[in-house]
Amino acid sequence: MTRSLVINTASHAVPIRREFRMAELTDRFGTMVFSEEVMKDYLPKDIWKRLAATLEGGEPLDLDVANAVAHAMKVWAISKGATHYAHWFQPLSGITSEKHDSFLEPNHDGTAITKFTGKNLIQGEPDASSFPNGGLRATFEARGYTAWDPTSPAFIKDDVLCIPTAFCSYTGEALDKKTPLLRSMSALSRESKRVLALFGKTPKKVVPSVGDEQEYFLIKKDAYRKRRDLVITGRTLFGAAPCKGQELEEHYFGAIRPTVSSYMKDLDDELWALGIPAKTKHNAVAPCQHELAPVYGEVNEAIDQNLVMMEKMKLIASRHDLVCLLHEKPFEGINGSGKHNNWSLGTESENLLDPGDTPLDNLQFIVFLTAVIEAVDNYQELLRASVASAGNDHRLGANEAPPAIMSIFLGDQLTEVVEKIIDGKASVHATRGVLDLGADTLPKLMQDNTDRNRTSPFAFTGNKFEFRACGSEQNVSDSNLVLDAAVAKSLKSFADALEGTPEDEFQDAALEYCKKVLTDHQRILFSGDGYSDEWPVEAEKRGLANNKTTADALPAFVSDKAIALFEETGVLTKAEAQCRYDCKLEKYNKLMNIEATTMVREARRTYRPVITAYPTKVAKGLETIRAAGAEAAMQCEQNTLNKLCNGITTINDSIKALDAVHQKAEALDGQEQANVYAHEVVPAMDTLRAAVDAMEEIVAADYWPVPTYDDILFYV
């Protein structure tokens, strides 16, 4: 019954119709954002100039300016239908938090006014002990503060004015994802400006930009509700492979189904109104998998927008009778979902990672390229730790995503450039070629300066680096703050070494410096197949780390090397870094506990009763066949019965084994607990899953208690 209900519901799904004219796009874009253009319209000129000094130059914000901004923000928000405001922040859980306060203020005579002051704008006071804090706040030390981040614009979401804020403790420690990210941006800007000054340039600031390609799955809500493992953990803990997966390679860039297209259009509409520049949408590799990519933006605002985007993706899916799955691996045997973090660095006038047509002649680019290579090699384990999570462990190294080994892919042209610098042959350069496709009706194409290597975790793609190891569900603040801090450290080393060099000697000295650094860190460059069995062996020879699980990776976050980096760049104190390690570890352990508990309970209560009862039906059929004297058919049924009985024994043994190692893990805590979960509980879960999945392929479809992969993946 379950299977037929799912199929019947899906086959009669009708896409939600909506009216939308592309001519409205430019007028609609950003209408729910208190942008700089809106500020100019609502603020007096002198107030706007003083606020602009804060936005552009980091000048302190005076209270009279805050009061004027708050009043303008309130008037604008109410005109858009907002009734409440909220300090919108990112605690260490990685998701967003908000508390809604009404603009209404009652009078003593029973009437009411609307009120929103500068103090309401710039500071809030949530309970710091109720959020993940790694021990920085005890229950009796509840006070924490949210502080307005004027560099990320306020926006209206569901009739609530959301004000992006930082979150810190009463004693000043950062308790959020945003604060250290902003610090890393400052460090990177500071050191980049020092380097650019050596080239005679004085930009106002240097800003890292990010474009995050978001992958996700869409499935029918009815099927989702019938899968308790999906509801509780975000992924299927059981499920045999579907009859057809992604092997035909027909879903990637394929025609988008009407139901999904309708969802995507509604999502675009809401994101555009929120000023989120959603640009590209398409089917991804796996069935029911899709991707949404925005235009690049300043990293702080881009991450804010990605968090809003993920929230909207889930909300709008529900309106369409769908469920949006952001877990990194909701289905076994087909691709999981990632979030490719496209990172670049620029000033108000140039992209510092643009090599130009002759990169070997572009010394400034070579310096910044060298800094990135040095940063990734020096802090490879820290970068790996920044993307570590229970969900992402299922992707990394699984021949669908980059391996857990950090390496850099530069492409043939830049690899040649690096080799020439190392060899001292700086007079020869590569230039971009022209691709002739061999047909008169097709245009000639300019060849990019890199090919694409989908197996590389950190690939140069023309004028940016694509960090492909990030998980789809993750807040990528950690990845970006680590990258920012590491590159800032490399640039600082360059500036310290080269400042004071006579102008006529600078180019030779800079190239010689790059030659030494590239020689020392050439091991991190790899252009081959990251999925191959040979690469881990080669990586070990090169001395590259291979931290396969979250439990293996997280200690790097509090290594002496990491703490020194964080403290030198001013991104995190030792206590703040320890806090983040503790929170990540605690989250991993809690998620693994939930998964193991759910798996044992589902195996006992949902799957085993059906699998145990089914042999009775087979045995009755066997007796009927025996009475009929059909020897061949009888042998077939006997084999099925034997498989079922053996399978039941295997399932029972697997449940006991998982229970035992789970109890062992529960008796521990911290890193020891994580080690047991990663290296003992997960293998035991895999064994139990394999035993149940084997029975799914034998038990009749009408008996199976939950929707199968075939039911879920092909009826949206």
Question: Where do the language-model regions lie?
Answer:
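Flexible inter-domain linker/hinge segments
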Residues: 3-12, 18-37, 186, 190-194, ...
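Active-site core of metal-dependent hydrolases
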Residues: 28-141
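Gly-rich Lys/Arg/Thr-decorated short loops/hinges at beta-loop-alpha junctions or inter-strand turns
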Residues: 22-35, 54-56, 243-252
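Active-site-proximal loop/turn and secondary-structure-junction residues that shape catalytic pockets
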Residues: 65-69, 89-91, 119-120, 167, ...
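Glycine-rich, acidic/polar active-site loops that bind/position phosphate-bearing ligands
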Residues: 142-326, 335-338, 345-582
